[in-house]
């Protein structure tokens, strides 16, 4: 009987090492979150410290963009640090024209270490006002 107790403890310890880890939060799971346009609008109304990132070309941005957005074309996002986005934990809300480039850019940003990326599709579905120029 006394031999069974140590053996039981060893087996119990070995089995606890076989459990699966808890799922990682989104920010640690090397992914971004996709949300609807309505969810994006609600998030913009609720949050204060966020960046709206337009990943279309400079020409598309100048023709019309969401007020307050900055432009960093998808094609320029790569392996180098992005000076306009110094805080990798800040909420960055990404959009493009139809939703394709914003998904690509969001994936690239996550690979660069950004942890709070939200992709909300394209300006084609934006119900709010837009502004033109390179403000």
Over which residues does each language-model region extend?
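Structural scaffold elements adjacent to functional motifs in cytosolic proteins
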Residues: 51-54
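Rhodanese-like catalytic fold shared by cysteine-dependent sulfurtransferases
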Residues: 2-7, 13, 18-43, 62-91, ...
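Histidine/lysine/aspartate-rich catalytic loop segments that bind and position anionic ligands
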Residues: 58
